[in-house]
Amino acid sequence: MKTALKLLVFVVTVVNAALAQVVPDATGPRVPISGSAHYDLHYSEIEYLGGSFNDSQSAVFSGDVAYANFSERLPFSLKDAGGYSWAVTGTPYEVGPFDNLSLSQGTVRRKWNLQLSDDASYRQGAPTTGFSGVAGTGEPIGGSTPPPSTSQTILTVNTKTVANSANGEFDRTLNFNTSLNLGGTSELLRYPDGNGIDTDSQTANGGLTWRLDARNSLSARYLFTQFSYPGNSLGLLTTTLITNSALFDYQRHWTRQITTDGSVGPEWVVGANSAIIPFSTRISGNASFQDQFRFGSASLNYRHTTSGGGGFLVGGEVDSVNAGFSKEFSKKVTTAFSGGYMRTVGLGTQGTIDGKFGAAMFTWRMSRFFTAFASYTADDQESSSSLPSNALNQTLQVISFGIGFSPREKHLESQ
């Protein structure tokens, strides 16, 4: 622990020195930079309890950074969380590097706007809590932290994954209360060690949104999605999967802090080889609740849709529920909770997988820059059919203690 503390202090010193450097005035033109930036560094020691990982211990050094500019016409944001985990004693559990990077660039004009985003990740297992998806690292959980992607709804053990999701959205104002919405998404999921089904998906959507008043809006949207499987190391019969959905959405801003959103509609599913995935008509929908109060936030999300199968099935019907809550007390103590339930029913006769997780975290700001934290996470998964050995098939508990370097948010201004 003393060695880790020395390492953390050294890294903090280097980072602060870099941020504090004064760059001399250049003779040429400079690109103005303005925005808010924040970063954290964490060191944690983790114990795993349950099954083959009972009494295993590991250590994690991690960090996260976030930046958003102040531009109203060209908004840009960046968020990255990653680190490295190594085994201390017992059976190694998800050791190695991990990272999740998210970029977003917008263009806002008087009658139209364009939003481009990309999310890329490398992990040692399916994501659960926090932006990085790795439990016990010390990064924030709960609150408005986005739920894990539905492309990995099956919990795994020591399973390297590479994932990327590129998204584009275009909105055009047609009149005072009507706008045209167009978008597209391309996703990929890869298993470098060959212990999962590589999956690609492409989605195109279009629709209209009607603004009823300052707080309420309705929308109708059509979505086309195609799933394909370029790599299949599990020996399952695969086929291209196509879904068509029509969703009708209602959104309401109850206050400046509270927003609810819900959509529902029919979904038609068909496989290129109907012997593997026959044609079917289903229901697709989602609902969300967001509350951003003064000293914290809360969220609740539900999704019912057809997925590519979570890396272990050829298509799946997914029910996903995720909740988060965080609250700050007296500017020194923060408590946070997050949890989720994921049910994946294989299309055809592939069985049902039920996964769930829950986490609690306590953070204490010891001084202006340093924090201490403790967290507890529990994962559990059951399946009605046999799954590969790298799919979680037991209850796993994760207990973590650590320290962090967490300076206040910085505001950057240059002309």
Pin down the residues of each PLM region.
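Hydrophobic h-region of N-terminal signal peptides that target proteins for export
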Residues: 11-20
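Gram-negative and organellar
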Residues: 19-415
